[in-house]
């Protein structure tokens, strides 16, 4: 069964040790999304979507270093269904075709992408898209060479190159801050 620690489930499957998001953290995240939607049923959908997008990106960035791709897909599907039920409740007399035209679009091979059109204060028409956790790339932790130490002068170049590479690769999706400070 493994154990849960800081929202992660650490478990051995056969000969492999896999770290995944724990079921309790997934449930609490989806519950927070449900509550956000319930609270914001009367707010404009664009504002609600941008609030949900911030939560999705933050949650996915936290779990992006572990085995989480299938979990991200399942979370995206659950959020989509929660939002779909919300708009059906919000517009009970409208047809499915009307709902599709107003709240969904397609881009490339992706269909049924949830959107919320809005107008800015300057009169510009814009669209907010529902972000998907599955779009955030999984990045594994790069292991440090076991004999390397940042306090030894002969390894300074190694840690400089590593810091530059990591700061580029490990930057959190959706933020401007680097994920790794220079050593």
Role assignments for model-derived ranges:
Residues 1-183:
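Non-catalytic terminal/accessory segments
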